[in-house]
Each structure stands twice: as C-alpha cells, then as structure tokens.
C-alpha cells in the first residue's frame, strides 16, 4: 500500500477489534452455562475452526497482474530504506522501541485485569462483559480513525493526545468505591482507543522512518517490544494487586507511562526521504508513480 497506508493498516486489523467486542459476551455466556473449562476449549477452537481455514483458502501472494502498477514495474529492484542493522544504529529506533514498551505495559495489563477491577467496584459479570465489549469497539474506532489521520498528518502529533487520554482512564479506575457504569465505559473506551492506535502506529512508523528495504525484520524487532511488554504487564498488574492489595500504584505508574510514551514519539523528528525508484533503476519504460511513498 502506498497512498493510504495508514488507513489500509487500520482496516486490515479490524478483525481483532470485532473479536474484542464479541468475545467477552460470548465467553460470559459460555462460563455461565457450561463452566470455564468448556469456555477455554471453545476459545481454543476458534483459531483452528475459523482463522486457519480462511488463511489456507484465501491468504496468498498476489499474481503479477493483481499487483499495483508501481510494484509490478519495480520487479526485483531493491526497495529503498534501512537494513535492520542500520536501523538499530539510529537513536530513533530505540526511542520508538521504548515508546511502544511503555504504552504496552500501561494498557495491556489493564485490559487483562479490568474485569477484576470492575468486580471489586461492584460490577456484575455481565456488566463487566459489556464494558469489555466497549473496549473492543473503541479499538475498532482507534484503528480506523488513527489510520486515516496518519495519512494526513505527522504521526507523533496525531498520537500525542490519543496516547495521553488513557491517563484519565487510570485516574477513573483509582480507588475501590462504587463506579458509575457510564464512567467505567468512558475509561474503557479511552484505553481501547489508544490500544488500537498504537497497533496501527507500530506498523506505520516502521515503514515511514526506516523504509521498506527490510520492513519485515524491522517491524518484527519493534513488535518484540509489544510482545515482551504485554507479557510483563499482566504479571506486573497482578503482582502489585496481590502484594499491596490495590491496583492504585500500578494505575498511577501506567498514567505516567502513557504520557511518557506519547512524548517520546515527538523526538523521532521528520520522516526521512529515502528517494524514489527511478525509471532507469527499474530498467523499465514505465514512469515512476509520483504519489508512491
């Protein structure tokens, strides 16, 4: 994708958002009627029964005639950009890595423990499931809206308010007193919106700041920050709750991490210009596409 890469990424990732909306309600029904063991087994069957067949039947490399003209014309010419080693020597690579890690630690554990937080505030299981469905809806909105804005404006400016707003969610969730349903929904929506935005952001910025030459490798290493931080975050939230008896300390730390992660992105600077593949470099008579990025 060249012209609207941000929106394309957002649309591609909406499947996880739909799952996040539907699965809390489905899981609650399964637990209530069949128990948690059956619920786990049913969830395990979903990727085998739905995702795997879809991938085997329809996920493939496009044929030459199906490719966009600018890609088909380029043939085997190397794409512009950095190699993984070159990217890792740039400070902005580690700035982006740190930003991803901070924001992921902040929201990933909150997502896992949000039903527990709501239960401690007097929410029934069905009410907590409804709030989690709103979380999924906001991920959907975050991916589409952020993807569209990334194509129009400088990414760090787009994401600064989006990643700072979940700090308000952390403040809302502090304490152990009664919590209004609409307030809980607001907290879940803001955090979910940021979650959707960040997923778009990693894929988008990997291409804009380091080019497409080694995009897969660079994106993979950047995504390690997401995967490792998500694993640490859920355990960290649980450890704080079990040790101190409250989620408040980790929620305060998460609010700081949201803001710090957003501010770090401002240090990335303008997008590099990797140049465009010329007609001579392509060895083709096809003129280069001036709108290709």
Residue ranges and their predicted role:
Residues 1, 9, 197-210:
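Intracellular juxtamembrane helix-capping segments at the cytosolic ends
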Residues 16-63:
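Helix-loop-helix hairpin linking two adjacent transmembrane segments in secondary transporters
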Residues 20, 209-244:
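A late C-terminal transmembrane helix in Major Facilitator Superfamily
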Residues 25-34, 118-119, 149-150, 236-245:
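Interfacial helix-cap and linker-helix signal at transmembrane-aqueous boundaries
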Residues 52-58, 255-283:
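Multi-pass alpha-helical transporter architecture, strongest
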Residues 60-82, 275-284:
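Flexible cytoplasmic inter-helical loops of multi-pass small-molecule transporters
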Residues 85-148, 233, 237:
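Extracytoplasmic gate region of multi-pass secondary transporters
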Residues 107, 127, 133-139, 145-148, ...:
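C-terminal transmembrane helical hairpin of 12-TM major facilitator-type secondary transporters
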């Amino acid at each position: 994708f060249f012209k609207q890469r941000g929106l394309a990424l957002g649309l591609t990732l909406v499947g996880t958002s739909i799952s996040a909306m539907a699965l809390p309600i489905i899981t609650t029904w399964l637990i209530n009627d069949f128990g948690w063991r059956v619920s786990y087994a049913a969830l395990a069957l979903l990727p085998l029964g739905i995702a795997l067949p879809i991938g085997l039947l329809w996920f493939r490399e496009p044929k030459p005639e199906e490719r966009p003209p600018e890609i088909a014309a380029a043939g085997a010419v190397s794409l512009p950009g950095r190699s993984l080693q070159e990217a890792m020597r740039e400070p902005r690579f580690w700035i982006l890595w740190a930003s991803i890690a901070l924001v992921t630690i902040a929201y990933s554990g909150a997502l896992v423990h949000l039903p527990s937080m709501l239960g401690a505030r007097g929410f029934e299981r069905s009410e907590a499931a409804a709030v989690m469905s709103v979380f999924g809806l906001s991920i959907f909105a975050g991916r589409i809206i952020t993807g569209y804005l990334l194509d129009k404006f400088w990414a760090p400016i787009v994401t600064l308010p989006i990643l700072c707003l979940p700090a308000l969610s952390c403040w809302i969730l502090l304490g152990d007193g009664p919590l209004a349903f609409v307030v809980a929904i607001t907290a879940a929506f803001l955090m979910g919106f940021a979650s959707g935005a960040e997923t778009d952001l990693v894929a988008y910025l990997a291409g804009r700041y380091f080019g497409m030459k080694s995009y897969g490798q660079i994106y993979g290493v950047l995504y390690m920050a997401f995967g490792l931080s998500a694993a640490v975050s859920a355990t960290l939230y649980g450890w704080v709750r079990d040790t101190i008896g409250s989620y408040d300390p980790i929620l305060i730390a998460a609010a700081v991490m949201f803001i710090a992660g957003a501010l770090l992105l401002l240090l990335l600077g303008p997008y590099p210009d990797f140049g465009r593949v010329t007609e001579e470099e392509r060895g083709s008579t096809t003129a280069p596409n001036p709108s290709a990025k």
